[in-house]
């Protein structure tokens, strides 16, 4: 049930942002991107922008990708004042056009992510952009971080 409310909150944020914004999704970076591999994605990432807007100071989402197990753990407080964690598996697929797709599933039979994402890595693997592939125009910017803060 907690996951339902989290997904509902994310959907409401996305719908609100989409409804009040007349802008097209943020363009993908012009600088040369690097191959999106399990090794390149491995490690800790912090969401810094959603739909072109910076995250509110008290709101956060961190995700830690494990290249060996193809698993992730995500910590966020998007729909709660307390940290929640979500786990699951992810896959990376290179498309015929040379782009990369990131898709995933949640643990405990919750199901698949709401959409797949085109992923671009740049800035020597320190920056990452996700853009939804299902037409919903979701755009998320991440930066690599050394570690994820401890949440109590």
Provide a role label for each language-model segment.
Residues 1-9:
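Bacterial N-terminal signal peptides that target proteins for export
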Residues 23-25:
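Bacterial signal peptide processing site
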Residues 98-120:
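An anionic, turn-rich surface loop/hairpin at beta-sheet edges
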Residues 28-46:
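N-terminal helix-cap/turn-to-beta initiation motif at the start of protein domains
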Residues 41-71, 105-113:
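Short, solvent-exposed loop/hinge segments that bridge or flank secondary-structure elements
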Residues 30, 85-95, 127-152:
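Edge beta-strand at a domain terminus
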Residues 18-21:
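C-terminal motif of bacterial Sec signal peptides marking the signal peptidase cleavage site
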Residues 55-101:
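N-terminal glycine/threonine-rich, aromatic-flanked beta-hairpin/loop signature
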């Amino acid at each position: 049930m907690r996951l339902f409310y989290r997904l509902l909150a994310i959907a409401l944020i996305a719908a609100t942002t989409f409804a009040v914004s007349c802008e097209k999704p943020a363009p993908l970076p012009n600088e040369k991107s690097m191959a999106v591999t399990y090794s390149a994605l491995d490690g800790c990432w912090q969401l810094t922008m959603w739909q072109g807007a910076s995250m509110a100071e008290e709101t956060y989402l961190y995700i830690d990708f494990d290249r060996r197990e193809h698993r992730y753990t995500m910590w966020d407080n998007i729909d709660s004042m307390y940290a929640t964690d979500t786990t699951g598996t992810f896959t990376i697929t290179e498309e015929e056009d040379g782009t990369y797709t990131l898709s995933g599933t949640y643990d405990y039979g919750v199901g698949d992510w709401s959409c797949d994402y085109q992923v671009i890595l740049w800035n020597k693997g320190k920056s990452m952009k996700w853009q939804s592939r299902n037409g919903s125009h979701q755009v998320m910017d991440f930066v690599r971080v050394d570690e994820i803060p401890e949440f109590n």
